[in-house]
């Protein structure tokens, strides 16, 4: 095993969460190493950005680079219910984009390098502990094992949930939305709406947990996803191709119409049990950000936005912890902030799936419309005193009580 280096912060994973955490830590004068197992660019879903994510990108000074990369503007989200009924439109209040994640994530990685984040391609194998505190990691690179020491180890490994698998963070627990499988692929030649709505996200649903996304990720390429319950997938489908075909036939005729002359690019893929949470996700010398501790139903595209926001907020907690030699107060504050925002988003999504028609009505309610639009734009962590989250929570609690009685 080689000699080890020491850093203030070691980050596992260089997706949006890891890159933003690294950038913000470097701005605060901390030394940062990011260890990434995959060679970039690499494929990833999560291609539609909220308005909140768009603002973070502008704050990074990347707006011109986003436009130069050909990422389409995202005017809004069109939600279409069964048989094209129950349709409503969600405008985007802050400019943002649809993205090809391989290029977008690579852009964030380059920005992190510009800020002085050091990178190492390698596979993290284990953590190093001393007197119960996490003090580093062991990783494999170039067929050798290496040690690196850290004041804080950050798990930004996404759905690999590294620290959970190693027994450092809590166990991965299923969420309400977990019993689904998403199948997805990219296509050229998809029929789009007329400008200025041609680059909207389109969500089509037939009934609870049966839905599809269509996301324009470049001037000539669209992402199609079909999401169905796991038991239906295993009953009707042998592979992701079958699931996509099933969705075209059964979720909405609009999918077939738009894709009748389209050509698929590359293979289709699938992902199961994608909704989970992990508790605890902070501890002595470590914390988790983004998908490494929680992932919700992706219907409203919160994933990248929440990952970036948590990366930024975690950097604040890390700086406070190191400066004050306090490994509890700042990390617990980050935990509580994260849980609060994530729960508001989870309530909103559950409310939509339980009361989809009434959710559309709430979009037209003058007392709630602005709040709902802002929540859908990613402002779930900054909504103290708003009416909408309380309405959603009360309705869900009443629904759950009736389910227990009935």
UniProtKB/Swiss-Prot annotation:
Tagged with keyword Flavoprotein: yes
Keyword Flavoprotein appears in the UniProt entry: yes
InterPro entries attached to this UniProt entry: FAD-bd, FAD/NAD-bd_sf, Flavin-dep_Halogenase_NPB
One Pfam family in the UniProt entry: FAD_binding_3
Keyword vocabulary terms for this entry: FAD, Flavoprotein, Oxidoreductase
Record-listed FAD binding positions: 17, 36, 42, 44-45, 48, 101, 124, 291, 304
GO molecular function, one term: oxidoreductase activity
Null allele phenotype: Deletion of the gene abolishes the production of several bromopyrroles.
Annotated EC: 1.14.19.57
Top-rank taxon, per record: Bacteria
Its job: Brominase involved in the biosynthesis of polybrominated aromatic organic compounds. Catalyzes three successive rounds of bromination of pyrrolyl-S-Bmp1 to produce mono-, di- and tribromopyrrolyl-S-Bmp1.
PANTHER family: FAD-BINDING PROTEIN (PTHR43747), SLR1998 PROTEIN (PTHR43747:SF1)
Family per similarity comment: Belongs to the flavin-dependent halogenase family.
Name by which UniProt lists this protein: 1H-pyrrole-2-carbonyl-[peptidyl-carrier protein] brominase
Lineage of origin: Bacteria, Pseudomonadati, Pseudomonadota, Gammaproteobacteria, Alteromonadales
